[in-house]
Amino acid sequence: MNYFSAYFDVIAVAPKGEGWEELQKQQARCIPVKMSRAINPIFDLITLFQLVKLFIKEKPTIVHSHTPKAGLLGMLAAWIARVPIRMHTVTGFPLTTATGIKKQILRFTERLTYACATNVYPNSQKMCDIICSMGIGNPKKMLVIGNGGSNGIDTAFYSRNATQDIKISTFDFTFGFVGRIFYEKGINELVASFIRLQKDYPNIG
């Protein structure tokens, strides 16, 4: 946000909690809004009303949302408030692991999110393909930025010297995982795969 603040008037809207103090260190005006990760119709309606009220007051040119819940409420509120550019980045897709009535609800909410957005940015080509194949998003709105790695990697920042401390050689193949340690992120399958691979390939870490 520090980068964008050099060119735009940036407002960060998020619930208070973990990471809030770090958010306030950014060069942006921070406005707290209560938001629940879980499906909670009454609480979500209150949040939606707060966002609509905020967008009408601030009159932003662009609203950019992340995560399923923030995307649903943010894009719907921006559409109601007639914000001209409504951008949603798809960084989570719980629909793929949900079942029964929950899956139907999530399918509807995802479809509504993409319908309210003017631009949708899946974080990988695979994610884009899934969304389009399920028929819940308009392919004309979809764009995968930088093959899913829009920020890139600063190779000068990450040093290979750290691998020596944990005894990883140049010839070892190392896997990494970034995400919440949660079954919906596929952590169980990932650990099972690591165990299986290590039995056959000793140079995998």
Regions found by a protein language model. Give the residues of each.
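N-terminal strand-loop element at the rim of the active site
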Residues: 1-43, 130, 135, 141-142
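Short beta-strand scaffold positions
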Residues: 14, 64-65, 121-123
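Donor nucleotide-sugar binding/catalytic pocket of nucleotide-sugar-dependent glycosyltransferases
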Residues: 29-32, 111, 115-161
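Nucleotide-sugar donor phosphate/pyrophosphate-binding loop at the beta->alpha transition
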Residues: 42-49, 84-85, 94-116
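Active-site proximal beta-strand in glycosyltransferases
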Residues: 62, 78-93, 110, 121
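Short His-centered aromatic/hydrophobic patch
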Residues: 65-71
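Nucleotide-sugar donor-binding and catalytic loop/hinge architecture
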Residues: 157-174, 199-200
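A conserved mid-protein helix/loop that constitutes part of the nucleotide-sugar donor-binding site
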Residues: 173, 177-196
